[in-house]
Amino acid sequence: MNKRKILVTSALPYANGSIHLGHLVEYIQTDIWVRFQKMQEHEVHYVCADDAHGTPIMLRAEQEGITPRQLIDRVWHEHKTDFDGFHIGFDHYYTTDSPENQAFCEDIYRQLRAGELIAKRSVEQFYDPVKQMFLPDRYIKGECPRCHAGDQYGDSCEACGATYLPTDLISPYSAVSGARPERRTSNHYFFKLSDVRCEAFLKNWIFESIPAQPGVALETRPRLQPEAANKMNEWLSAGLVDWDISRDAPYFGFPIPRTGGKKFFYVWLDAPVGYFGSFKNYFKQNQRTQAEIDEFLRPGGNTEMVHFIGKDILYFHALFWPAMLEFSGYRTPTQIYAHGFLTVNGQKMSKSRGTFITAESYLKQGLNPEWLRYYYAAKLNDSMEDIDLSFEDFVARVNSDLVGKYVNIASRCAGFITKKFGGELTHNVSEASRKWFNQFLFCELGEGDTFLGRHMSIANFYERREYSKAIKEIMSAADVANQYVDRMKPWVLAKDSRNDRELHEVCSVALNMFRMLTVYLKPVLPKLAMEAEQFLGLDPLTWKDANSQHRLLPDGHRINDYQHLMTRIDPKQIEMLTHANKESLAPAKSQQVAQAVETMEKNSSTTPAPAKEGEAGQASASTISIEDFGKIDLRVAKILDAEHVPGADKLLKLTLDVASEQRTVFAGIKSAYDPGQLKGRLTVMVANLAPRKMKFGISEGMVLAAGDGEGPYLLSPDEGARPGMKVK
């Protein structure tokens, strides 16, 4: 097999927050593919970096009273620790705030300028007079010009999905200072993506098929997944627009040459260029020559460049990035693989539900990172579909597959080999056992008596990123191995010394099956595979070991004493994990306030008691201090949806928008409101009420309603209030 030379990247995590389980989908997906390629002895270089520039980093550093570089250095170490904890095997992890990256950015800019693909234009922007800075789109909020939802970002509406210019917002305000922004003009630099040269290049590049590489069981490969190519075609058909690549000072980033330090490269220009900066720094550290660097970064070399990204950044990677590279003298990506998002238990990750889980928290709670690597692999395919982390399925699948099927083979057979046969395996097996072994090694291919080596089928699935199919095939082989052990019953054979030859044979064959499964699973479970190699007394396994003509280990091969390889997941561990990650919008309330809220909650979910004749309302409850009242976190919420609850006489199920997330609340207002009346309405909710498990689901708060025999009457804020606002 000829060696491939591949530069592989994952999208750069932003140096302004923690790595969470959603991020890990991409890094685990990439790492599995890289490890598989390396097991085939291809030359693969997996590089990444922290995306370390931009306004959010500048502002956060200011809030913390440190410099941006102090912030990004701290976050770099946090990210690297998280990635190491999940066995993400970067060959190099760097930062975009580097001299290499700056040199690449400036060179690309100069080449595009020389090719007349940079334009200078005056643009009108919002300016914060308090902070004395132009505001990025995401730091401007206001009322959507289409649906009039409040508290929407300056570039798109999360309520109706509309996109618009920040200057289109109604009643805009600065998310940095709260001030009303001013409109000011400034000269900006644009990459002319609308140029006919860019359009012609992209139309050809996007739909171009790539010749198969040596050792890949595909005649040609598409550059993009079909759904990604279709999306690109939509954007091309709508017409390409020029891309603003500059930002005004103050800004944390690289200054644009010949602008006197007043203009900076937009973070989205220098971020993908960071792939090149990281790669060059890595090769320099390993004393590689400029010619070797150019082989990967310049056109004409027999190398590949493969990007793994989330589907939300496809526009940047499949339009701007290749066009910039093509017209600045650099090589373009060979392939771009986009993946979907992660949901947890069928819903978006949520801090209130404890499902917005950081990598650090997962590891600190003592959960095995390879449990998650395996589960993601069992769910991932080659499409851009979202994947769901169902905790119930997570526990069941890991316990069944990894412990019950894979590790179980070794634990059931190793002891007999070490105790009765000095730890030595036999190569002499009966025809019956050889048939079992062949059934393990080969899988049916279509109809009839056509068979394919299972290692070839699994390899093809790994290559195409169809990991779920690879896992299914591997577990099918594991089923054969366990059926063999169950049929031969070594624990019964061991009771009579006259069965020693057969016992030796059965346990040796089973451990050879375990060895093959270890080869298959090694890209997914690198640490477990290493421990299995040590137990089996083997050098690091490669894919050749799955393809060997001598698939049984030699006669007399010695194994080591078996050590426990993996534990089962206890469901209580998941409960502790979600509990540790639950976060209210405000600190927990006191017991006195909890009792007050409980009383309010009862009143909101039942018909209020009628007032006595002649009374305007019910008597006041016992007093509480202003400090205790302040512990109740009241927030403005927008009702996104309302629906009847089957089997409930008084409840409506409300989906609420509180700006930072969505909440589900069951409210006892069915007698007074039709669901259709409530959609789009603003109300007030208790946001830090502990989630309560009800017969119909989990209620994540409580809406406020008044009543003294009539009603209930849902409380609504005055005009101008926006979702997420705190009621004071």
UniProtKB/Swiss-Prot annotation:
Enzymatic reactions = tRNA(Met) + L-methionine + ATP = L-methionyl-tRNA(Met) + AMP + diphosphate
Annotated positions binding ATP: K351
Give GO terms for biological process.
Answer: methionyl-tRNA aminoacylation
What are its cofactors? Answer: Zn(2+)
The protein's Enzyme Commission number: 6.1.1.10
InterPro entries in the record: aa-tRNA-synth_I_CS (IPR001412), Anticodon_Met (IPR041872), Met-tRNA-synth_bsu_C (IPR004495), Met-tRNA_ligase_1 (IPR023458), Met-tRNA_synth (IPR014758), Methionyl/Leucyl_tRNA_Synth (IPR015413), MetRS_core (IPR033911), MetRS_Zn (IPR029038)
Q: Which UniProt keywords apply?
A: Aminoacyl-tRNA synthetase, ATP-binding, Cytoplasm, Ligase, Metal-binding, Nucleotide-binding, Protein biosynthesis, RNA-binding, tRNA-binding, Zinc
Q: Where in the cell is it found?
A: Cytoplasm
Can you tell which superkingdom this protein's organism belongs to? Answer: Bacteria
SUPFAM superfamilies tied to this protein: Anticodon-binding domain of a subclass of class I aminoacyl-tRNA synthetases, Methionyl-tRNA synthetase (MetRS), Zn-domain, Nucleic acid-binding proteins, Nucleotidylyl transferase
The listed location of motif 'KMSKS' region is 348-352
The terms describing its cellular component in GO are:
cytosol
Q: Which residues bind Zn(2+)?
A: C144, C147, C157, C160
Q: Does the keyword Metal-binding apply?
A: yes
The record's note on quaternary structure and interaction partners says: Homodimer.
What HAMAP family does the record tag this protein with? Met_tRNA_synth_type1
Task: Please give the name of this protein.
Answer: Methionine--tRNA ligase
| Species lineage | Bacteria, Pseudomonadati, Pseudomonadota, Betaproteobacteria, Nitrosomonadales
